[in-house]
Amino acid sequence: MSEYLPEGKLISEQENINILHSLKMLEDAKNSEKILEAKACVCDSSHNLIVDLAGIKGIIPREEGAIGIKDGSVRDIAVISRVNRPVCFVVTDITEDENGKPIVMLSREKAQRKCLDAYISRLRCGDIVPARITHLENFGAFADIGCGIVALMPIDTISVSRIEHPAERFTVGMDIKAVIKSVENGRISLSHKELLGTWEENAERFCAGETVSGIIRNVENYGAFLELTPNLAG
């Protein structure tokens, strides 16, 4: 089970499920700082996330909810928005409440730090990584490339053929492959068009005289540009 995947990819893995069902295995995971995933059910009035660990209560304190929460560089919406979604974490402590029921203290921030140090910091331009689309804007798509750490894919890197909005290619929650385009000052930029084939590879799919359908992408006085594939227009 690889640890450094977009959030939501580990939650259904059998190893992850087995650990969540065992206090002993949760203790072992604490000692090894293993990254796990479970669903965040509630965000309380202090912005702590309550996580369901197969019937055991898990708590991610607000300041452990994401990198940047402690120093104020990231807003609390980064924590609040995780309700009803999978969250990654490492186990930091196992205690009991006043009734003797176990409470497991968790840190998403530590899981993200581990992902940054062991995985994302080692990525280089040209590397191909799994990613999950988290939200779309006019200027590009944001994608989780590991443990909830998000990178931007500018709209002009999504495909060779021009589009008006990333929603023409992606939907939120969609799993894709992405290419590391640049790494500058800790900020990662992604690209997708390199994975859609070259002009020649796309052109080989069509024959002269063949009737095909496409999308009109631009109209000029001298003609219209028709998209046949995301990386082929004529």
Where are these regions (language model features)?
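Single-stranded RNA-binding regions, centering on S1/OB-family and related RNA-binding modules
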Residues: 1-234
